[in-house]
């Protein structure tokens, strides 16, 4: 069941669902608008191969902190970004992230794993790709995506406690921690 605005507000007021910071205008009829944080990770062009088994790969990324002047994503550039909001989902609630159509119409693809598991806690790292042939300027604090919540029939037996639990800010891939 997708949660409506009334139920989202109830869960926030009861502190079962945490979204911080949150302004009441971010709550939409069936979602919550999330805003862009101000730190970005960029893959330098001198990295020849992104080796998923390289535990040092994340240290090779360039961190950029944007101010009110904004951040420019070059054509065909891939970067990592984050939401300003820190979220904490209860064990019976899952969510998925949807990019804003208005940004998609400018060529900005906003991706992530798409699904936020029950029990997750942290900022949400977003993957951006500028598919346009022109640079695109974005600004910290702007609405960047929507979080849609779904209540599960029962709480998760094993809620999320994975490698991204508690992440703060833009977080690089931790695939090297996978056991398979």
Curated annotation (Swiss-Prot):
EC number(s) in its UniProt entry?
Answer: 3.5.4.30
Question: What are the binding positions for dCTP in this chain?
Answer: 100-105, 117, 125-127, 146, 160, 167
Which catalytic reaction applies to this protein?
dCTP + 2 H2O = dUMP + NH4(+) + diphosphate
Q: Which InterPro entries match?
A: dCTP_deaminase, dUTPase-like_sf, dUTPase_trimeric
Keyword vocabulary terms for this entry: Hydrolase, Nucleotide metabolism, Nucleotide-binding
| Gene3D superfamilies cross-referenced by the UniProt entry | 2.70.40.10
| Statement: the UniProt record of this protein carries the keyword Aminoacyl-tRNA synthetase | no
Give the active-site positions: 127
Q: Which residues form a coiled coil?
A: none
Q: Would the keyword Transmembrane be found if you checked this record's keyword annotation?
A: no
Q: What class of enzyme is it?
A: hydrolase
Please indicate which residues carry the site annotation Important for bifunctional activity: 114-115
The pathway this protein participates in, as annotated, is: Pyrimidine metabolism; dUMP biosynthesis; dUMP from dCTP: step 1/1
A molecular function (GO) held by this record is: dCTP deaminase (dUMP-forming) activity
- Pfam families in the cross-refs: DCD
Any one GO biological process? dUTP biosynthetic process
Q: What does this protein do?
A: Bifunctional enzyme that catalyzes both the deamination of dCTP to dUTP and the hydrolysis of dUTP to dUMP without releasing the toxic dUTP intermediate.
What family classification does the UniProt entry report for this protein?
A: Belongs to the dCTP deaminase family.
Oligomeric form and interacting partners: Homotrimer.
Q: Which HAMAP family match?
A: dCTP_deaminase (MF_00146)
Full protein name: dCTP deaminase, dUMP-forming
In its UniProt entry, the species of origin is given as Persephonella marina (strain DSM 14350 / EX-H1)
């Amino acid at each position: 069941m997708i949660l409506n605005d009334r139920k989202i507000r109830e869960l926030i007021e009861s502190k079962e669902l945490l979204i911080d910071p949150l302004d009441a205008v971010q709550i939409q009829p069936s979602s919550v608008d999330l805003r862009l944080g101000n730190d970005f990770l960029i893959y330098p062009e001198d990295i020849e191969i992104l080796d998923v088994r390289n535990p040092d790969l994340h240290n090779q990324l360039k961190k950029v902190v944007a101010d009110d002047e904004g951040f420019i994503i070059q054509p065909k550039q891939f970067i990592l970004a984050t939401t300003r909001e820190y979220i904490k989902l209860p064990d019976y609630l899952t969510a998925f992230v949807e990019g804003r159509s208005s940004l998609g119409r400018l060529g900005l693809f906003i991706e992530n794993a798409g699904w936020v598991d029950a029990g997750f806690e942290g900022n949400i790292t977003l993957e951006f790709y500028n598919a346009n042939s022109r640079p695109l300027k974005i600004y910290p604090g702007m609405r960047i995506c929507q979080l849609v919540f779904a209540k599960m029939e029962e709480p998760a037996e094993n809620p999320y406690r994975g490698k991204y639990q508690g992440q703060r800010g833009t977080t690089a891939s931790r695939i090297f921690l996978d056991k398979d």
